[in-house]
């Protein structure tokens, strides 16, 4: 009989194939778990509850980047009256020289506006402007005006700065070459009232007046009323050295161009500021179609397009007759010494109340 145990051989377990199978199964389970975790990040349900997969590369190809939604914003358009200076039909009062009396003058009537003279018709400055030139004259009340103005300008009433332009003897005499109006002999010109004037054709004159207007706007005035924007109209006018009129049809056209040029300089200096620009005209000039060849005024040719209003000193009984379709609805402002009840055009500047 053969030696050893019969019917048995050495035991080797289940063998290598079983171990390989288990390893593969374990790997598949791990991969499936990882795939499920990744898939969850790209799973979504629609409104009907159906499951969808959104693969990252497919999403980038199919869906363009959407800009963030802009919230609905209600745009409030500003009132044209506010942009133009808050009111159109003004009932204004011209305040006097003494700031201590201003509140009394304002409360004496139902005014929605007021005017303050910042540069008088003789050239005197009633406000201590930062703009300086040799020969300027500053009023003794200038500091009182500076102190009183902020309260008025911060109030609800419409504000007008009255600014005289070319009748300024002291500056004309001390700055004759750069600013003064000369006679034909080369000296300063004296008009019929023995007064001296600035020359509107000279750049320094334009710059000075434009700078004053800018300061008025920056103070907070709603409107700047220019007065004495004219050449002299009294005296020996043939003795004025107006400058060369070469290239112009006549002397009057040259003078009108200089006045219009000065107004343009002021207007351009005020660009970007919410302020109106207005002009005072004598009654005779306004009734003559806005033309004064001697003074260089041609209202509807170079001036009116730059103006918001025209102020005209006039008798109360003539007011309604002056109003036209072209100049009315607040564009024309009569300067009155009294306001009669019979006037239907309720727009005025009351002088010397």
Predicted regions and their residues:
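Catalytic domains of carbohydrate-active enzymes, especially glycoside hydrolases
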Residues: 99-125, 215-227, 302-311
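Active-site-adjacent "subsite" loops/lids of carbohydrate-active enzymes
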Residues: 83-94, 166-214
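Aromatic-lined carbohydrate-recognition surfaces of secreted/lumenal glycan-active proteins
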Residues: 94, 160-167, 225-228, 252-296, ...
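N-terminal Lys/Arg-rich, disordered targeting/topogenic segments
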Residues: 1-18
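Substrate-binding cleft of secreted/luminal carbohydrate-active enzymes
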Residues: 38-47, 299-353
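Aromatic- and acidic-residue-enriched segments that line the glycan-binding/catalytic groove
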Residues: 128-136, 168-189, 232-246
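Glycine-rich, aromatic-flanked loop segments that form ligand/cofactor-binding clefts
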Residues: 113, 141-189
């Amino acid at each position: 009989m053969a030696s050893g145990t019969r019917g048995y051989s050495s035991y080797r377990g289940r063998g290598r194939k079983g171990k390989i199978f288990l390893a593969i199964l374990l790997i598949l389970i791990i991969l499936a778990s990882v795939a499920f975790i990744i898939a969850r990040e790209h799973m979504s349900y629609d409104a009907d509850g159906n499951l969808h997969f959104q693969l990252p590369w497919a999403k980038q190809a199919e869906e363009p980047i959407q800009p963030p939604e802009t919230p609905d914003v209600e745009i409030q358009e500003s009132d044209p009256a506010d942009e133009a200076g808050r009111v159109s039909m003004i009932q204004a009062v011209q305040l006097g020289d003494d700031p201590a009396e201003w509140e009394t003058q304002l409360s004496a009537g139902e005014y929605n506006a007021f005017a303050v003279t910042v540069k008088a018709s003789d050239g005197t400055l009633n406000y201590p402007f930062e703009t300086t030139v040799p020969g300027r004259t500053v009023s003794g009340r200038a500091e009182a005006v500076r102190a009183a103005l902020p309260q008025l300008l911060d109030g609800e009433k419409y504000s007008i700065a009255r600014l005289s332009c070319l009748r300024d003897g002291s500056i004309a005499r001390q700055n004759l070459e750069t600013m003064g109006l000369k006679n034909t002999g080369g000296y300063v010109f004296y008009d019929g009232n023995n007064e001296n004037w600035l020359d509107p054709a000279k750049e320094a004159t334009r710059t000075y007046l434009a700078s004053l207007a800018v300061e008025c706007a920056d103070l907070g005035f709603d409107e700047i009323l220019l007065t004495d924007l004219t050449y002299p109209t009294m005296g020996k006018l043939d003795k004025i050295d107006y400058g060369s009129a070469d290239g112009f049809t006549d002397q009057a056209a040259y003078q009108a161009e200089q006045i219009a040029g000065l107004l343009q300089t002021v207007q351009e200096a005020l660009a970007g500021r919410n302020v109106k620009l207005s002009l005072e005209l004598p009654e005779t000039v306004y009734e003559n179609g806005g033309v004064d060849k001697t003074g260089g005024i041609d209202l509807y040719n170079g001036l009116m397009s730059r103006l918001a209003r025209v102020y005209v000193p006039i008798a109360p009984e003539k007011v309604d007759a002056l109003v036209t379709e072209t100049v009315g609805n607040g564009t024309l402002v009569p300067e009155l010494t009294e306001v009669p009840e019979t006037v239907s055009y309720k727009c005025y500047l009351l002088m010397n109340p």
